[in-house]
A protein has these predicted regions:
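Short acidic/polar inter-strand loop motif in beta-rich domains
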Residues: 120-127
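N-terminal secretory signal peptides and thylakoid transit peptides that target proteins
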Residues: 1-13
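Short coil-to-beta strand junction motifs in C2/discoidin
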Residues: 63-71
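Short beta-strand elements
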Residues: 128-140
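Short amphipathic, basic-aromatic surface patches that mediate peripheral association
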Residues: 52-62
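Short, compositionally biased P/S/T/A/G/V-rich stretches that sit at domain boundaries
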Residues: 24-44
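A glycine-anchored, Pro-Gly-centered beta-turn/N-cap motif
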Residues: 45, 69, 108-110
Length: 140
């Protein structure tokens, strides 16, 4: 392999990880919040969770419009949220990729924490992280 070819291969190898770790920027004044339920709310059965967002827009998953993303509801999640992380899709990380601003949520009886996290077109956490305050609800 010639010196030029080796340099080209090394340069390409250096670029690929950087692209894979790219983080989508968010405005520093973006504000995500849960409109309802309120922190400490006691709820009977399923409920409508309403999402609020300021200084950014809502877009469907896959839509790369700048300063826009879609909601994810974290249920009973305690792991830290880091910019660039891919948001898992499971019962604790509920994706709203159609651009929903409210959703009917069904949880088993008991205490639960809820937190909204805004994801980019590829379900990655923005930089800086755009997340609501974590709230606690009790379902009976």
């Amino acid at each position: 392999m010639s010196l030029m070819t080796r340099r080209a291969v090394l340069a390409a190898a250096a670029i690929i990880p950087a692209a894979a770790l790219a983080q989508t920027p968010a405005p520093s004044d973006a504000y995500l919040y849960i409109i309802w339920p309120n922190d400490g709310q006691v709820i009977k059965g399923a409920f409508w969770c309403r999402f609020g967002l300021r200084n950014m827009g809502i877009a469907r998953a896959g839509d790369k419009t700048p300063n826009a993303g879609h909601h994810h509801l974290f249920v009973n999640v305690n792991e830290p949220i880091k910019p660039g992380d891919v948001i898992p899709a499971d019962k604790n990380h509920i994706h709203y990729g159609a651009g929903q601003s409210e959703a009917r949520v069904e949880l088993p009886p008991g205490r639960h924490t809820l937190q909204l996290v805004l994801g980019d077109a590829d379900h990655k956490v923005f930089n800086p992280v755009v997340a609501s305050k974590k709230i606690t609800v009790t379902v009976y």
